[in-house]
Amino acid sequence: MASELHVDAIKHSGGTSAMTIDSSGRMTLPAQPRFLVTLSSNTTVPDGHDQDWSVSAASWTEKFDVGGCFGSGLFTSPVAGVYHITYQMYCNPSAGSYIGAGMNGTAITDTYGLTNLWHFQAGGNDTGFTHTALVDVAAGKTIQFGTYGNGSSTARTDGTFIYGYKIA
């Protein structure tokens, strides 16, 4: 025999709302981890591999950060689960050069068995690319966002951002 539970909201015993279901069946999860940050100012992409560029060279403007997942250029999973992470860079590499972006850290190593996930784009004039990954991680795992440049380049504020959210 099947049972039905008729509720409008689910809350923690302390009163924190965990989930709301409206009359159409749409759910809201107000505490579900998610973040969006944008590059605060145009930033040099160094020649060669800079594994921790998001931490050491770039500064970020936080648009939102539910769950405190992003700080000082580093994503940290606040709770275990599967996260969708996107890193987009818009820059102007010099002619004949290329630009790359990497994701590395314990979340990448645990999920993919790799130290870095890479994405490369040919240079010359303005170029942009998006680098996306799913990670299945325990709480406290991290991702930092790196670059790999060949020639001079500048990451631009009008198209460089990082976002992520927990999907399961």
Q: In which residue ranges do the predicted regions lie?
A:
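Surface-exposed, short loops/turns at beta-strand junctions within beta-sandwich domains
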Residues: V135-A139
